[in-house]
Each structure stands twice: as structure tokens, then as C-alpha cells.
């Protein structure tokens, strides 16, 4: 008997520049995303690559505009989202208000409701605060 469940269709989102002091080759980002989608039974649509200009989120914004043609986005990491809180939260709110979702392959997380929004924002705030902590 065939499974008639329709797979979610998510567009990949990768970086061509370092993010949060990390640098991951594009082909590795795509491998991680493809593996994540395979394990979650998600149809992976080829990745869009963010522009190399510092702080650019032009491709991410374009993906959000294109959401009506897919079920969501799968990014390599939550730390590829804009560092600016207002910009990041605006993008997340646009995704939620479209009844779509965004997944983060490395962290194994997805944003699809207010609880997941708050959880991901908490992770962001910890990551941004850690460099200012003196552990000695």
C-alpha cells in the first residue's frame, strides 16, 4: 500500500560567508541540509545562497516572499539568521503569519509557532551574550 502523505517542500538556505565566527563550505552546508530533509521525510528544494556582503539578508527576504510556492525554508543554522533582533524577528513573524515554517538543520530545530519562536530567540540571546561573559 502506498503512503499518500504529501511531503513538505522546503527550500534550502546557505551562506557563502562566515557567520557568528563560523565558516562552513557551501557543499557541506548542502550535505547537512539534504541529510536533515531525508531523515524528516521532507522534499528538499535546491538551496538559495545568501550574498557575500556583510549582514546581507537579501536572499532570505526573497525566500520569505516566495513562501506561497513552498511549505517553508530549511537553513543550515539558526546563526545564519540576521544578527539584528528586529530584523530577525520580523523575518520570523513573516514566516509565521504566512502559516509556513523554517527549519535549522544543524540544531535540529524548527520555527512554526510562538513557542518555537521564543525558544529560538532565547538561544540567540544566549549566543549573543556569551562573548561578554568573564568565566575566570
Where are these regions (language model features)?
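Short, structured surface patches at the beginning of a domain
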Residues: 1-136
Amino acid at each position: 500500500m502506498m503512503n499518500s502523505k504529501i511531503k513538505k517542500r522546503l527550500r534550502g538556505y546557505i551562506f557563502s560567508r562566515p557567520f557568528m565566527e563560523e565558516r562552513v563550505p557551501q557543499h557541506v552546508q548542502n550535505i547537512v541540509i539534504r541529510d536533515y530533509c531525508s531523515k524528516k521525510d521532507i522534499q528538499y528544494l535546491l538551496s538559495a545562497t545568501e550574498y557575500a556582503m556583510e549582514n546581507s539578508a537579501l536572499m532570505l527576504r526573497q525566500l520569505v516572499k516566495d513562501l506561497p510556492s513552498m511549505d517553508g525554508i530549511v537553513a543550515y543554522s539558526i546563526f545564519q539568521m540576521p544578527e539584528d533582533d528586529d530584523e530577525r524577528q520580523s523575518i520570523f513573524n513573516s514566516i509565521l503569519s504566512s502559516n509556513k515554517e523554517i527549519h535549522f538543520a544543524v540544531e535540529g530545530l524548527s520555527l512554526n509557532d510562538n513557542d518555537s519562536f521564543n525558544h529560538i530567540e532565547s538561544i540567540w540571546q544566549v549566543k549573543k551574550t556569551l562573548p561578554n561573559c568573564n568565566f575566570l
